[in-house]
Amino acid sequence: MHKLVLASGSPRRKELLAQLGYTFDVVLPDIEECKAEQETAAEYVLRLSQQKAQAGLALVSESSIVVGSDTVVVCDGQVLEKPHHFADAQRMLTQLSDRRHQVMTAVTVVSAEKQHSIVVTTEVWFKKLTQEEIEQYWQSGEPCDKAGSYGIQGLGGRFVTRIEGSYSAVVGLPLYETDQLLHEFI
């Protein structure tokens, strides 16, 4: 019997994996999240999910199956990661205001024998944001730990006018695709 492990400290990923009905343990892999200069957003998010899964596998028993995931927001070809401070979040949210952007979530499932990955891209449209809305949103504390400085599942959902793709992928773990990957291992 294989033990399932989530290599992530994200409460949203924990909730989503539990929503699929799986029982799992959690490990916190320590990897450096730094985009290489020539790397595309899809290559970057895929590499991070693979590194998280592999680092997680190194922390658990050989018979484990490990899920690693990462999410990035992309606007104008630029990767928007977690903000470091208010000015960072303000810049990102102003850039996303009244436009479309992409949210890319990569999932990697790995065992001692094999590894499978997928990148899910969702198109997201934002309403026009005022500076007051951006400041109030920052004061809520929600943007601090989120790629692109917003969480669609929280207060940031009020900014989203439309999505095309996977809502759960925008939150942090695409349910359908993750379940399909896990069925290749379990």
Curated annotation (Swiss-Prot):
Site (Important for substrate specificity): 12, 71, 153
EC code: 3.6.1.9
Enzyme's top EC category: hydrolase
Biological-process GO terms, alphabetical: nucleotide metabolic process
Pfam families for the chain: Maf
InterPro entries (UniProt xref): ITPase-like_fam, Maf-like
Active-site residue list: 70 (proton acceptor)
Cofactor: a divalent metal cation
Catalytic activity: dTTP + H2O = dTMP + diphosphate + H(+); UTP + H2O = UMP + diphosphate + H(+)
GO MF entries: dTTP diphosphatase activity; UTP diphosphatase activity
Keywords for the protein's UniProt record, in alphabetical order: Cytoplasm, Hydrolase, Nucleotide metabolism
Subcellular location: Cytoplasm
GO cellular component, one term: cytoplasm
CDD domains: Maf
Function: Nucleoside triphosphate pyrophosphatase that hydrolyzes dTTP and UTP. May have a dual role in cell division arrest and in preventing the incorporation of modified nucleotides into cellular nucleic acids.
UniProt family annotation: Belongs to the Maf family. YhdE subfamily.
Protein name per its UniProtKB record: dTTP/UTP pyrophosphatase
Natural source organism: Vibrio vulnificus (strain YJ016)
